[in-house]
Amino acid sequence: MKKQLLSALIGASLLAPMAASAADYVIDREGAHASITFKVSHLGYSYVVGRFNDFSGDFSYDAAKPTAAKVNVKVNTLSVDSNHAERDKHIRSADFLNTSKFAQATFTSTTVEDKGNGDLVINGNLTLNGVTKPLAINAHAVGEGQDPWGGYRAGFTGTTTFAMKDFGIKMDLGPASSHVELDLVVEGVRK
């Protein structure tokens, strides 16, 4: 009996390293395989669309246990780009992002919900304009695998919406323009 138990323990200890575990990834911003874009309704007739050109982050992910995933992102708010220099200057002002005081926004996940078929809800805290609030991102695991350069990558998309007033942005653009929609594309390179 002792020999069988010992054999089982040895066998289990040999198999343990083969069990799936979360891998750590760094967001591939140098290869331009990630983006943070936003859109805000313009008077209810159209949209102002922009992006943040400078951000960084990392995440851990295991497809076998997506609820254990973790995400951390830092955004340089000075890098906002709506393809219009004067508007960008206004977005950076105290009317909106107040980048002279708050040059960085952050998102840190707290929990991840697995909705099946690669769909996830990433719950976390967004700090923007000096205000931290909970935010849920509807995400989808696009895929993962070896790249042609000997690395391993995982990619995701995500969307979320938040009210500007929740983050201390009091500029009144009218009721049709009170929310910001974020579209996220993330490709990470395994560390």
Curated annotation (Swiss-Prot):
GO cellular component terms given for this protein: periplasmic space
SMART domains: YceI
Keyword Endoplasmic reticulum among UniProt keywords: no
Principal location listed in the UniProt entry: periplasm
Signal peptide location: 1-22
Keyword tags: Periplasm, Signal
Keyword Nucleotide-binding: no
Locations listed in the record: Periplasm
Protein family (similarity comment): Belongs to the UPF0312 family. Type 1 subfamily.
Matches recorded under HAMAP family: UPF0312
Family annotation (NCBIfam families): PRK03757.1
Protein name as catalogued: UPF0312 protein Sbal_3041
